[in-house]
Amino acid sequence: MNKHILVTGGAGFIGSHVTDLLIERGYRVTVFDNESTGKRADVNPQATFVHGDVRDEVALEAVFKTGINAVIHIAGQASIRLSFMHPEADLNVNTLGTINIIKQCIAHRVGRLLFASSMTIYGTPDIAPTPETAFPAPVSYYGVTKYAAERFAHITATRKDLDFEFNVTSFRMFNVYGERQSLTNAYQGVFAIFMGNVLRGEPINIHSDGEQSRDF
Protein backbone atom coordinates (compact mmCIF):
# COMPACT_ATOMS: atom_id res chain seq x y z
CA MET A 1 0.00 0.00 0.00
CA ASN A 2 1.26 3.49 -0.85
CA LYS A 3 2.30 5.63 2.09
CA HIS A 4 -0.28 8.16 3.22
CA ILE A 5 1.10 11.70 3.59
CA LEU A 6 -0.71 14.56 5.33
CA VAL A 7 0.09 17.99 3.88
CA THR A 8 -1.15 20.84 6.05
CA GLY A 9 -1.49 24.07 4.11
CA GLY A 10 -1.69 21.99 0.95
CA ALA A 11 -3.95 24.49 -0.84
CA GLY A 12 -1.27 27.19 -0.67
CA PHE A 13 1.21 27.80 -3.45
CA ILE A 14 4.00 25.87 -1.71
CA GLY A 15 1.79 23.10 -0.36
CA SER A 16 -0.03 22.56 -3.64
CA HIS A 17 3.27 22.01 -5.47
CA VAL A 18 4.43 19.61 -2.76
CA THR A 19 1.15 17.72 -3.13
CA ASP A 20 1.58 17.51 -6.90
CA LEU A 21 5.08 16.07 -6.51
CA LEU A 22 3.99 13.51 -3.92
CA ILE A 23 1.14 12.28 -6.11
CA GLU A 24 3.46 12.16 -9.12
CA ARG A 25 5.72 9.88 -7.07
CA GLY A 26 2.90 7.55 -6.12
CA TYR A 27 2.00 8.67 -2.60
CA ARG A 28 -1.52 8.90 -1.24
CA VAL A 29 -2.06 12.49 -0.06
CA THR A 30 -4.53 14.20 2.23
CA VAL A 31 -4.53 18.00 2.16
CA PHE A 32 -5.64 19.81 5.33
CA ASP A 33 -6.21 23.53 4.80
CA ASN A 34 -8.56 26.25 6.07
CA GLU A 35 -8.38 28.11 2.73
CA SER A 36 -7.55 31.41 4.46
CA THR A 37 -4.90 32.11 1.83
CA GLY A 38 -4.82 28.90 -0.20
CA LYS A 39 -7.19 27.99 -3.02
CA ARG A 40 -9.14 24.77 -3.29
CA ALA A 41 -8.78 25.03 -7.08
CA ASP A 42 -5.00 24.60 -6.72
CA VAL A 43 -5.31 21.27 -4.91
CA ASN A 44 -4.52 18.23 -7.03
CA PRO A 45 -7.81 16.40 -7.74
CA GLN A 46 -6.14 13.10 -6.84
CA ALA A 47 -5.59 14.31 -3.27
CA THR A 48 -8.19 14.01 -0.53
CA PHE A 49 -9.11 17.52 0.63
CA VAL A 50 -10.18 18.27 4.21
CA HIS A 51 -11.19 21.81 5.13
CA GLY A 52 -9.77 22.36 8.58
CA ASP A 53 -7.61 24.49 10.84
CA VAL A 54 -4.49 23.35 12.72
CA ARG A 55 -5.88 25.04 15.83
CA ASP A 56 -8.78 22.56 15.78
CA GLU A 57 -7.60 19.44 17.59
CA VAL A 58 -10.82 17.54 16.91
CA ALA A 59 -10.53 18.06 13.15
CA LEU A 60 -6.87 17.06 13.22
CA GLU A 61 -7.58 13.92 15.19
CA ALA A 62 -10.18 12.83 12.63
CA VAL A 63 -7.60 13.14 9.85
CA PHE A 64 -4.90 11.27 11.77
CA LYS A 65 -7.35 8.43 12.41
CA THR A 66 -7.39 7.74 8.65
CA GLY A 67 -3.88 6.31 8.97
CA ILE A 68 -1.13 8.84 8.34
CA ASN A 69 2.47 7.71 7.72
CA ALA A 70 4.15 11.12 7.59
CA VAL A 71 3.28 14.80 7.91
CA ILE A 72 4.50 17.75 5.88
CA HIS A 73 3.43 20.71 8.00
CA ILE A 74 3.27 23.88 5.91
CA ALA A 75 0.13 25.55 7.28
CA GLY A 76 0.80 28.79 9.13
CA GLN A 77 0.53 32.54 9.30
CA ALA A 78 3.39 33.78 7.12
CA SER A 79 3.34 37.57 7.38
CA ILE A 80 5.83 39.42 9.57
CA ARG A 81 3.67 42.53 9.43
CA LEU A 82 0.55 40.67 10.53
CA SER A 83 2.50 39.05 13.36
CA PHE A 84 3.04 42.49 14.88
CA MET A 85 -0.60 43.46 14.34
CA HIS A 86 -2.02 40.23 15.78
CA PRO A 87 0.68 38.49 17.85
CA GLU A 88 -1.74 36.22 19.69
CA ALA A 89 -3.09 34.86 16.39
CA ASP A 90 0.47 34.31 15.16
CA LEU A 91 1.27 32.34 18.32
CA ASN A 92 -1.92 30.30 18.11
CA VAL A 93 -1.45 29.30 14.47
CA ASN A 94 2.31 28.91 14.16
CA THR A 95 3.33 27.59 17.57
CA LEU A 96 0.23 26.08 19.15
CA GLY A 97 -0.93 24.75 15.78
CA THR A 98 2.39 22.95 15.40
CA ILE A 99 2.09 21.58 18.93
CA ASN A 100 -1.30 20.17 17.95
CA ILE A 101 0.33 18.41 15.00
CA ILE A 102 3.07 17.02 17.26
CA LYS A 103 0.50 15.76 19.78
CA GLN A 104 -1.37 13.91 17.05
CA CYS A 105 1.86 12.44 15.72
CA ILE A 106 2.57 11.07 19.19
CA ALA A 107 -0.97 9.80 19.74
CA HIS A 108 -1.01 7.98 16.40
CA ARG A 109 2.67 7.00 16.31
CA VAL A 110 3.47 8.93 13.15
CA GLY A 111 7.25 8.85 12.99
CA ARG A 112 8.07 11.47 10.36
CA LEU A 113 7.44 15.22 10.47
CA LEU A 114 8.74 17.74 7.96
CA PHE A 115 8.18 21.31 9.13
CA ALA A 116 8.14 24.49 7.07
CA SER A 117 10.09 26.92 9.22
CA SER A 118 11.50 30.28 8.14
CA MET A 119 14.73 32.19 7.62
CA THR A 120 13.30 34.83 9.98
CA ILE A 121 14.50 32.76 12.92
CA TYR A 122 17.99 34.15 12.15
CA GLY A 123 16.87 37.76 12.58
CA THR A 124 19.46 40.05 10.99
CA PRO A 125 22.58 37.86 10.79
CA ASP A 126 26.02 39.34 10.16
CA ILE A 127 27.02 36.51 7.81
CA ALA A 128 25.95 36.32 4.16
CA PRO A 129 25.24 33.85 2.74
CA THR A 130 23.77 32.79 6.07
CA PRO A 131 24.76 29.23 7.07
CA GLU A 132 22.34 26.88 8.78
CA THR A 133 24.56 27.01 11.86
CA ALA A 134 24.08 30.77 12.35
CA PHE A 135 22.74 31.58 15.81
CA PRO A 136 18.93 32.01 15.88
CA ALA A 137 18.05 35.55 16.99
CA PRO A 138 14.59 36.40 15.63
CA VAL A 139 13.62 40.08 15.62
CA SER A 140 9.94 39.63 14.74
CA TYR A 141 7.06 37.94 16.50
CA TYR A 142 6.70 35.73 13.42
CA GLY A 143 10.31 34.58 13.73
CA VAL A 144 9.81 33.84 17.42
CA THR A 145 6.72 31.71 16.80
CA LYS A 146 8.40 29.72 14.02
CA TYR A 147 11.53 29.12 16.09
CA ALA A 148 9.44 28.06 19.09
CA ALA A 149 7.57 25.60 16.86
CA GLU A 150 10.90 24.22 15.61
CA ARG A 151 12.15 23.67 19.12
CA PHE A 152 8.97 21.93 20.26
CA ALA A 153 9.26 19.55 17.31
CA HIS A 154 12.98 18.82 17.62
CA ILE A 155 12.89 18.44 21.40
CA THR A 156 10.02 15.98 20.99
CA ALA A 157 12.27 13.97 18.67
CA THR A 158 14.77 13.55 21.54
CA ARG A 159 12.24 12.30 24.09
CA LYS A 160 13.19 8.98 25.66
CA ASP A 161 9.65 8.12 26.76
CA LEU A 162 8.29 7.62 23.23
CA ASP A 163 7.89 3.99 22.17
CA PHE A 164 8.62 4.78 18.52
CA GLU A 165 11.20 6.75 16.55
CA PHE A 166 10.09 10.32 15.80
CA ASN A 167 12.16 12.05 13.11
CA VAL A 168 11.86 15.77 12.43
CA THR A 169 13.30 17.94 9.67
CA SER A 170 12.78 21.71 9.59
CA PHE A 171 13.20 23.76 6.42
CA ARG A 172 14.22 27.38 7.06
CA MET A 173 12.91 28.81 3.83
CA PHE A 174 14.08 32.10 2.33
CA ASN A 175 11.59 34.21 0.33
CA VAL A 176 9.91 31.39 -1.52
CA TYR A 177 8.20 32.47 -4.74
CA GLY A 178 6.61 30.87 -7.75
CA GLU A 179 3.53 29.81 -9.65
CA ARG A 180 0.22 30.06 -7.74
CA GLN A 181 1.56 32.68 -5.35
CA SER A 182 -0.72 35.67 -4.89
CA LEU A 183 0.65 38.84 -6.49
CA THR A 184 -2.01 41.03 -4.88
CA ASN A 185 -1.40 40.13 -1.24
CA ALA A 186 0.59 42.94 0.37
CA TYR A 187 1.63 40.58 3.16
CA GLN A 188 3.46 38.16 0.85
CA GLY A 189 7.21 38.07 0.24
CA VAL A 190 9.11 40.85 -1.48
CA PHE A 191 9.48 38.97 -4.78
CA ALA A 192 5.73 38.55 -5.16
CA ILE A 193 5.12 42.17 -4.20
CA PHE A 194 7.64 43.45 -6.76
CA MET A 195 6.37 41.13 -9.50
CA GLY A 196 2.83 42.26 -8.83
CA ASN A 197 3.95 45.89 -9.13
CA VAL A 198 5.62 45.21 -12.48
CA LEU A 199 2.68 43.28 -13.96
CA ARG A 200 0.26 46.02 -12.92
CA GLY A 201 2.52 48.75 -14.29
CA GLU A 202 3.03 50.22 -10.84
CA PRO A 203 6.25 51.67 -9.43
CA ILE A 204 8.38 49.51 -7.15
CA ASN A 205 8.64 51.29 -3.83
CA ILE A 206 11.89 50.75 -1.96
CA HIS A 207 12.11 52.23 1.49
CA SER A 208 15.21 53.76 3.07
CA ASP A 209 18.23 54.49 0.82
CA GLY A 210 17.98 51.41 -1.41
CA GLU A 211 21.36 50.11 -0.29
CA GLN A 212 19.98 47.46 2.05
CA SER A 213 20.50 43.82 1.10
CA ARG A 214 19.64 40.36 2.31
CA ASP A 215 20.50 36.73 1.66
CA PHE A 216 17.98 35.20 -0.74
Locate the predicted segments by residue.
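N-terminal Rossmann-like NAD(P)+-binding domain of SDR-like oxidoreductases, especially those catalyzing
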Residues: 1-176
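Aromatic-acidic/polar surface patches that form glycan- and anion
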Residues: 15, 215-216
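NAD(P)-dependent short-chain dehydrogenase/reductase
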Residues: 128, 151-215
